[in-house]
Regions:
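Extracellular beta-rich ligand/substrate-recognition surface
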Residues: 13-21
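Extreme N-terminal starter segment of soluble prokaryotic enzymes
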Residues: 9-11
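Glycine-rich beta-strand-centered segment in the early N-terminal region that forms part
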Residues: 29-43, 58-104, 120-121, 140
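NAD(P)H dinucleotide-binding glycine-rich loop of Rossmann-like/cofactor-binding domains
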Residues: 103-178
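Short, Lys/Arg-enriched N-terminal segments with co-localized hydrophobic residues
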Residues: 1-7
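Short Gly/aromatic-enriched secondary-structure transition segments
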Residues: 51-59
Length: 181
């Protein structure tokens, strides 16, 4: 019996270098036993994404060979799990909604989705979540109704952290900000 391999295509905004973003369709490799294939439903855009697009390899999270292995942009995203590698089937199932914690800091590296990975980022139709995300506990089941709320969790935590830091360092804010969901 011949095993039929599914060819998975994705369309994504990918970084090829400084000021070089391209909307491209490409094939995703088959996932390994330690990876998870997801469909992205919602992705937020961050100021650090803009800085990454302008700086290219000068950005601390962008790998040096991005021209040969373009990185999928976007790190604040949520969606649906499509396929689960056998080593994670005890915890994750196809059809489950997800969000993630993008600040991985895996083994001291600065790599994170949206800057560093060829097949892992939020500005895409589908992506492959690598093993280190599950190893770090950064892939999270999402039980909310609206995907956009999950993709806004990281920016909201940054805003709350900034106000908390300002309070504890006695910085005097010179502006007002209202956040509502």
């Amino acid at each position: 019996m011949i095993k039929e391999e599914l060819i998975m295509k994705a369309k994504a905004v990918r970084l090829h270098g400084a000021n070089d973003l391209r909307l491209e369709e490409f094939e995703l490799p088959e996932i390994t036993d330690d990876e998870i294939l997801v469909k992205v439903v919602s992705d937020s855009i961050c100021m650090s994404t803009y800085k990454c697009a302008i700086l290219g390899t000068e950005h601390k999270r962008v790998h040096e060979d991005v021209a040969e292995h373009p990185a999928i942009m976007g790190h604040e995203f949520a969606g649906d799990i499509v396929k689960v590698g056998k080593n994670h089937q005890h915890q994750f199932k196809a059809g489950m909604k997800f969000t993630l914690q993008p600040a991985l800091n895996y083994k001291g590296t600065m790599w994170s989705p949206g800057y560093s990975y060829e097949f892992f980022g939020g500005d895409t139709t589908y992506c492959i979540i690598p093993a280190e995300v599950m190893e770090l506990g950064c892939l999270l089941e999402y039980k909310g109704k609206a995907y956009y709320e999950a993709s806004l969790a990281e920016p909201m935590s940054c805003s709350i952290g900034a106000f908390n830091a300002a309070y504890h360092t006695q910085m005097v804010p010179t502006f007002s900000l209202a956040i509502s969901l």
